[in-house]
């Protein structure tokens, strides 16, 4: 049941104030702008929508669903299996480093909050412990998945405001324009079978790889 306490815990998890450092990464977006691939608000919006539909909804989100169920069932081996699967899906060193750093930061936080099993996975992906927190705080998977997509979207648009010449008001318009994409992404995450997971985006991988060697960067690599 999605009660007020669960709602408040979900709001805590998706808050930009969560001390995991997600704001420090652009997931290739910085190079895509610097390299001239994205020049306008419409370009950025289309890029973010494409990544959500063809990467987030086909890897991170469906794996989060599986890890959530594994935590519910107390099946640590399945948690570790899908955690490894998710980390193996990172196509560049930069993307893997980001997931590792966010996972370690969230692990440290959940341990300090005395959430059981937070230390079970040695190298947790962010989604692995996001799912654990959701199970512990009794946030239904449907709402947790929406929250996961929302915080990713918000972080991507926040990164874009530092890279593309549009202001905070335009950024809010982009978020609201892309918000309807969350529901179909969640639906896809629930229906994909195990052997359908892990779709890649070559342009995203190239942008991330080139960002690793970009001369001047605002975001971590």
Curated annotation (Swiss-Prot):
InterPro entries: UreF, UreF_sf. Its main location: cytoplasm. Belongs to the UreF family. Required for maturation of urease via the functional incorporation of the urease nickel metallocenter. It comes from the Bacteria. GO terms for cellular component: cytoplasm. The keyword Cytoplasm applies. GO terms for molecular function: nickel cation binding. The keyword Nucleotide-binding does not apply. Gene3D superfamilies: Urease accessory protein UreF (1.10.4190.10). Keywords: Chaperone, Cytoplasm, Nickel insertion. It is found in: Cytoplasm. This is Urease accessory protein UreF. UreD, UreF and UreG form a complex that acts as a GTP-hydrolysis-dependent molecular chaperone, activating the urease apoprotein by helping to assemble the nickel containing metallocenter of UreC. The UreE protein probably delivers the nickel.
């Amino acid at each position: 049941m999605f009660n007020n306490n669960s709602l408040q815990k979900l709001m805590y998890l998706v808050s930009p104030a969560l001390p995991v450092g997600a704001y420090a990464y652009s997931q290739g977006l910085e190079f895509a702008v610097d390299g001239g691939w994205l020049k306008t608000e419409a370009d950025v919006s289309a890029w973010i929508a494409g990544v959500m539909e063809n990467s987030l909804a086909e890897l991170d989100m469906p794996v989060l669903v599986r890890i959530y169920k594994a935590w519910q069932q107390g099946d640590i081996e399945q948690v570790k299996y899908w955690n490894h699967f998710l980390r193996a899906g990172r196509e560049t060193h930069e993307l893997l480093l980001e997931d590792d750093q966010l996972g370690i930061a969230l692990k440290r936080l959940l341990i300090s909050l005395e959430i059981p099993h937070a230390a079970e996975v040695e190298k947790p992906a962010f989604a692995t412990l996001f799912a654990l927190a959701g199970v512990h705080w009794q946030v239904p998977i449907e709402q947790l998945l929406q929250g996961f997509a929302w915080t990713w979207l918000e972080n991507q648009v926040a990164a874009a405001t530092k890279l593309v010449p549009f202001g905070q008001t335009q950024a809010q318009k982009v978020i609201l324009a892309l918000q309807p994409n969350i529901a179909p992404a969640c639906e896809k995450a629930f229906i994909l079978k195990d052997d359908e997971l892990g779709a890649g985006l070559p342009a995203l991988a190239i942008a991330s790889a080139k960002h690793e060697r970009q001369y001047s960067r605002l975001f971590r690599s």
